[in-house]
C-alpha cells in the first residue's frame, strides 16, 4: 500500500469543507482562541505532526521552504529561508504541508510503518516535489495548488473572515494589512483568498480595490 496517494481532482468546495471542518474541530477542543502566531503549529500538533527546523538544500527548481516525511509524521522547515521570520509566511508554509498530509498522504499506509525503526520507506526516500513547498510556486504542479488552496481555507475559513471584516473596509489596503496580521497570514495570502471568494476585485496595475459581487454587507 503506497504512502503517497495518486493525484486526483478535488473540487474546491470539497477542499474548503475539509479544511474548515478541521479548523472547527481544533477550535472546539480548546478553551482559548488560536493565536495568530501559532495557528498552523497548533493544528499540526492536533494531528500529531511534529515540526523540525533544519537546513534543506535547494534542488533544480530553487529553494525549498519545507517538506513532509509521512512515515515520521514530521514536517521539516528549512531553517535557511529568511522569509520564515515573517509569521504569515511561516503559518502558510506549515498549513501547506498539513494540506499535503490531509489530501495526499494515505494515512492508513502510514500507520503500518509508524512503529518501524526504518527512517523513511523507499517511496519517500526518492524526491517527491509535491511533498515540498517550493518558494517558486509558479512551477508547482496541481497537487501543490491543492495544498496551497487548503492552507488558505485552513488559515482563513469564511467564518473567520466575516469576523475579521467587522469595522473594516476591504477596499482599503490600510484595513487589509492589520486584518492579515490578525489572521496570521501574509497580505498576499489574504488578497488571493478574498479574490477567490469574490469579495474583492483588484486592479493589479493600479492596486485599486473594488467590492466583489460576493462581498458580505
Predicted regions and their residues:
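Active-site hotspot residues in diverse enzymes, especially metal/ion-binding acidic/histidine motifs
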Residues: 1-217
Amino acid at each position: 500500500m503506497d504512502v503517497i496517494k495518486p493525484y486526483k481532482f478535488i473540487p474546491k468546495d470539497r477542499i474548503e469543507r475539509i479544511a474548515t471542518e478541521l479548523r472547527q474541530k481544533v477550535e472546539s477542543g480548546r478553551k482559548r482562541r488560536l493565536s495568530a502566531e501559532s495557528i498552523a503549529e497548533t493544528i499540526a500538533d492536533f494531528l500529531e505532526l511534529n515540526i523540525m527546523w533544519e537546513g534543506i538544500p535547494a534542488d533544480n527548481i530553487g529553494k525549498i521552504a519545507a517538506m513532509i516525511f509521512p512515515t515520521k509524521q514530521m514536517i521539516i522547515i528549512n531553517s535557511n529561508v529568511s522569509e520564515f521570520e515573517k509569521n504569515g509566511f511561516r503559518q502558510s508554509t506549515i498549513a501547506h504541508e498539513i494540506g499535503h498530509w490531509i489530501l495526499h498522504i494515505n494515512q492508513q499506509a502510514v500507520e503500518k510503518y509508524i512503529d518501524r525503526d526504518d527512517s523513511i520507506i523507499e517511496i519517500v526516500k526518492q524526491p517527491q516535489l509535491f511533498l515540498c513547498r517550493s518558494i517558486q510556486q509558479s512551477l508547482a504542479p496541481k497537487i501543490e495548488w491543492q495544498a496551497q488552496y487548503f492552507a488558505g481555507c485552513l488559515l482563513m475559513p469564511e467564518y473567520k473572515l466575516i469576523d475579521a471584516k467587522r469595522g473594516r473596509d476591504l477596499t482599503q489596503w490600510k484595513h487589509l494589512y492589520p486584518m492579515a496580521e490578525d489572521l496570521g497570514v501574509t497580505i498576499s495570502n489574504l488578497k488571493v483568498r478574498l479574490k477567490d471568494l469574490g469579495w474583492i476585485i483588484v486592479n493589479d496595475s493600479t492596486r485599486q480595490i473594488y467590492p466583489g459581487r460576493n462581498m458580505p454587507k
